[in-house]
A protein has these predicted regions:
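Non-transmembrane alpha-helical segments in soluble domains
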Residues: 83-86, 132, 147, 164-167, ...
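A short acidic/small-residue loop/turn micro-motif
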Residues: 108-112, 116, 374-377
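Active-site Gly/Thr loop motif
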Residues: 267-270, 314-367
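N-terminal leader/targeting segments and the immediately adjacent pre-domain N-terminus
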Residues: 1-112, 139-140, 167-168, 172-174, ...
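Active-site SXXK
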Residues: 100, 118-142, 166, 240-244, ...
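Active-site-proximal alpha-helical segments within enzyme catalytic domains
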Residues: 169, 235-243, 282-305, 356-372
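Short, charged, amphipathic alpha-helices and their helix-cap/turn boundaries
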Residues: 82, 101-106, 145-148, 183-226, ...
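Active-site helix/loop module of the DD-peptidase/beta-lactamase fold
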Residues: 118, 136-179, 218-221, 235, ...
């Protein structure tokens, strides 16, 4: 089925009692269902709360400017406005913080300031920020072998890999991140996490993993030496999360709550989706409000705000990889589960499929958050246009 933009009539997904249009379990993250589903994960999948605690809410002051008519280019390079680009790129929420103040905030597609939106792979950066806190306390040494903390992985492709290799996604573990192939490794992650059922008509002899750790233990092969090259593989984040749980004796959701979310001054409790073993899906299962994603970005911009170690953030901004490792980031790199847009500005980004973005820029003192529900997993033209728009906003 085709998707729909915010300017187009919306189909009655989950409307009525009982609703006539219900997202299918196999395709809830595909169009048009994802336009509803990314804001209603708790109605689709089992989740665990990331409690905000009883502390204060960090109030975001407002210094609003109407950026709707700001001239920008659309995904085809043609003139449009910011409002037009947000419509073209299936935006659910868009937030601009400048000097920690709300400059621009827009909600679409039924989203509100209290709605939790699926992060997709922005969860990796949230998880890694708490990982950095544990490193700062001396609980984890990034130079140590992964098997120091997870000895079971000695029989897997991670044998001989350092923790830093996993943080930077430069381990040599063979893993296919082919989103459209249900039998790929990432397709098996969907089944292991409980995001999807076993595909109908699948080979009865094929053994599908029942939870994430079982899948990790089954990844026996390497495709290259550890440290030889960057290759984006979501499963690396799940390995990091198991290390965090092992050294702390706490589950991931509790760690993120105690070490980050309660100290952030969040508006709302967040949540993770969980697998059948109760494991919070670190690689993409986090959900939070638009403003709370902004607060997280601002915390990173404030060099950790005394929560995440400043030296961890500085090290994160210094990633180095070869050219053209990402079609939408020709000068980019990757470090500690964050994307670096360009080595000159060293702006950090949290990115997720279907158009999720937190852009953190020290030069402009800006944080930009875009939550979306693209019709496709990735769209280079949309991503490039969005980044150009972020820079246009900085000059406005």
């Amino acid at each position: 089925m085709n998707s729909y933009r915010n300017s187009e009539p919306a189909p009655p997904i989950m409307q009525g009692s009982p609703p006539q249009m219900v997202p299918p379990k196999l395709d809830w993250d595909r169009p048009p269902w994802n336009r509803w589903a990314f804001q209603h994960i708790r109605e689709i999948l089992p989740t665990v709360e990331v409690w905000r605690g009883n502390g204060h809410r960090h109030r975001l002051e407002r210094a609003e400017v109407n950026l709707d008519p700001l001239p920008v280019d659309d995904s085809m390079g043609q003139p449009t406005t910011l409002a037009g680009l947000l419509d073209e790129t299936y935006t659910d929420g868009f937030l601009v913080l400048k000097d920690g103040k709300i400059v621009y905030e827009r909600y679409f597609n039924g989203m509100t300031e209290r709605t939790l939106h699926l992060s997709q792979s922005m969860a990796k950066s949230v998880t890694a920020s708490v990982f950095g806190i544990l490193v700062g306390r001396g609980l984890i040494d990034p130079a140590s072998p992964v098997t120091t903390y997870l000895p079971e992985l000695e029989a897997t492709g991670w044998a001989g890999a350092s923790v830093q290799h996993v943080l930077d996604m430069t381990s040599g573990v063979r893993f296919s991140e082919e989103y459209t192939d249900p039998y790929s490794d990432i397709g098996q992650v969907d089944v292991a996490t409980g995001w999807k059922p076993v595909p109908p008509g699948s080979d009865p002899a094929f053994r599908w993993p029942s939870h994430i750790f079982e899948l990790i233990l089954g990844l026996k092969e390497k495709s290259r030496p550890h440290g030889a090259a960057f290759e984006y593989r979501s499963i690396e984040t799940d390995v990091l999360a198991f290390i965090m749980e092992r050294v702390s004796g706490k589950r991931l959701a509790q760690l993120v709550s105690e070490e980050l979310w309660q100290k952030l001054g969040a508006d709302e409790s967040a949540c993770f989706t969980v697998d059948s073993a109760g494991y919070a899906v670190a690689d993409g299962g986090f959900n939070a409000t638009l403003r709370d994603y902004g607060r997280f970005g601002q915390l990173i911009l404030d060099n950790g705000g005394g929560v995440v170690p400043a030296d961890w953030i500085e090290a994160t901004r210094n990633g180095r990889h070869g050219p053209d490792f990402s079609p939408s980031l020709p000068e980019g790199s990757y470090r500690n589960q964050f994307w670096i847009e360009d080595p000159r500005s060293r702006a950090l980004m949290c990115r997720g499929v279907f158009g999720q973005l937190i852009h953190i820029d020290w030069d402009t003192k800006m944080v930009v958050v875009k939550l979306s529900s693209y019709p496709n997993f990735t769209n280079v033209a949309y991503s490039v246009a969005t980044l150009k728009t972020v820079h246009a906003i900085a000059l406005a």
